[in-house]
């Protein structure tokens, strides 16, 4: 059982009591993202370079803020790129000033000539059936939000590549594949991210030096520009990579993956070398957990699981992450993977955390069910064994997929309505968006009603999938993701975007 250090108690108190950096950071993303996009060289202009220029500008220019007592530095911007701004120019002008922006910079931001000029390809509709059009028209059977193409956030990308190579190593990889595949806006965009990633740590190192935090300065001179050499550098590099990902398209369910597997080699090296204790490791993990809590938006992570050879992947970090979750005693998304052969001591410890924290965490995933379910839909066995969770526990293969986890939504209660109305809408009787399952007055048993409901469910799900697929060809044009592309297997190698 880990006992919180005085440092962690203070940082936890600041986070729980919402003492944050809002006065210093809330306008940083809004200004610097716009600056990067508006000042982009027109000769390099496309949607993917536009998005990269905005994110890279934030990486290069956002103020490096270091709180008292922090071991891990860097910050998210709340839920939304403009979190903290009010929409009222007078009030927001004061916010910009508190963020250190000059009156000339504020005037530039509000100048109507300084607009971001992207372009949008409208989604096609000709491939949808009449019933699918009607289902969408209701907005209650498919995607109540009225947007059938949610292509932002909800990811687990290959953070371990940043830990291993640093952004300088990733830049070398981008340059190598640009030669193989030919130069394009895609590789220009990825270079922008890599080059800015090499600056990000230096900015924090310089700030740390100014305030006498030489320990932070030493770490940030190494990461994220170069590969991590220690557990502390690995945690810091992971956090930098994660906030860059959230700076691309907000926090919402952008998640971290199997942290006990990603960080374990660095932990093991430092423990074996005698330069790290479990107490040190827990304190660093506490700092990471607090960072994730401060701007909480279901940033999921996972411990445990089964390797392809059938062996358990539970390790010492799996236990330490449970210890930290219990000690901090706040809602911090964490999942536990297990199977029939998992050490009962590990399961007991996870269940103790559930009972003591009493906030519904951790979540549990049974590999004996999940892995066969993934292979059954064509995912290779080794990849299936590496599955993890996004946000509200959607399943993903980390660093190897774009799951479109919340791309369209189905209202399955409509299946009951349609079954009771032979496919007609009760909101608009002229519409018949449901399947034709027969007049319910002819149903002679409850089983017949259930069969009709099941048929309507299949109809709604199939239509939802068709609508989502019809939008997907537009995602690359409308919403390219250079950061996620950089850290997703197959994208850089083939010159294709994450979306």
Regions found by a protein language model. Name each.
Residues 1-190, 210-499:
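Conserved catalytic cores of very large enzyme subunits
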Residues 190-193, 197:
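Amphipathic alpha-helix face/heptad-repeat signature
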């Amino acid at each position: 059982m880990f006992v919180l250090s005085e440092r962690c108690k203070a940082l936890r108190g600041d986070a729980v009591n919402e003492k944050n950096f809002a006065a210093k950071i809330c306008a940083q993303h809004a200004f610097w993202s716009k600056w990067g996009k508006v000042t982009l060289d027109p000769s390099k202009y496309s949607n993917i370079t536009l998005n990269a220029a905005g994110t890279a500008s934030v990486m290069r220019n956002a103020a490096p803020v270091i709180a008292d007592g922090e071991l891990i530095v860097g910050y998210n911007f709340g839920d939304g790129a403009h979190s903290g701004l009010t929409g009222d120019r007078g009030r927001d002008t004061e916010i910009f000033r508190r963020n250190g922006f000059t009156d000339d910079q504020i005037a530039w931001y509000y100048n109507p000539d300084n607009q971001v000029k992207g372009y949008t390809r409208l989604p096609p509709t000709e491939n949808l059936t009449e019933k699918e059009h009607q289902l969408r028209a209701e907005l209650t059977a498919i995607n109540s939000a009225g947007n059938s193409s949610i292509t932002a956030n909800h990811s687990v990308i290959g953070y371990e590549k940043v830990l291993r190579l640093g952004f300088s190593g990733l830049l070398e990889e981008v340059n190598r594949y640009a030669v193989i595949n030919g130069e394009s806006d895609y590789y220009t965009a990825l270079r922008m991210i890599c080059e800015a990633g090499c600056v990000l740590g230096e900015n924090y190192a310089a700030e740390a030096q100014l305030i006498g935090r030489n320990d932070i300065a030493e770490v940030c001179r190494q990461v994220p520009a170069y590969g991590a050499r220690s557990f502390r550098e690995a945690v810091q590099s992971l956090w930098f990579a994660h906030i860059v990902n959230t700076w691309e398209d907000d926090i919402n369910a952008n998640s971290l993956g199997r942290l006990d597997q990603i960080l374990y080699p660095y932990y093991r090296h430092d423990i074996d070398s005698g330069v790290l204790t479990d107490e040190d490791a827990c304190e660093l993990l506490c700092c990471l957990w607090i960072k994730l809590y401060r701007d909480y938006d279901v940033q999921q992570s996972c411990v445990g699981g089964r390797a392809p050879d059938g062996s358990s992947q539970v390790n010492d970090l799996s236990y330490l992450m449970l210890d930290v979750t219990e000690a901090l005693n706040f809602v911090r998304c964490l999942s536990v993977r297990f199977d029939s052969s998992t050490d009962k001591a590990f399961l007991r410890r996870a269940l103790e955390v559930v009972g003591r924290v009493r906030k519904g965490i951790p979540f549990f995933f049974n590999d004996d069910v999940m892995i066969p379910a993934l292979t059954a839909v064509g995912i290779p066995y080794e990849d299936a064994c590496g599955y993890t969770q996004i946000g509200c526990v959607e399943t993903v293969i980390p660093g190897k997929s774009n799951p479109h986890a919340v791309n369209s939504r189905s209202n399955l209660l409509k299946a009951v309505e349609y079954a009771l109305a032979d496919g007609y809408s009760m909101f608009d009787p002229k519409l018949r968006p449901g399947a034709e399952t027969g007049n319910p007055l002819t149903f002679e048993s409850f089983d017949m009603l259930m069969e009709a409901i099941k048929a309507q469910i299949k109809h709604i799900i199939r239509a939802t999938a068709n609508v989502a697929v019809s939008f997907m060809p537009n995602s690359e044009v409308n919403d390219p993701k250079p950061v996620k592309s950089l850290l997703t297997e197959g994208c850089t190698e083939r010159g294709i975007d994450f979306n």
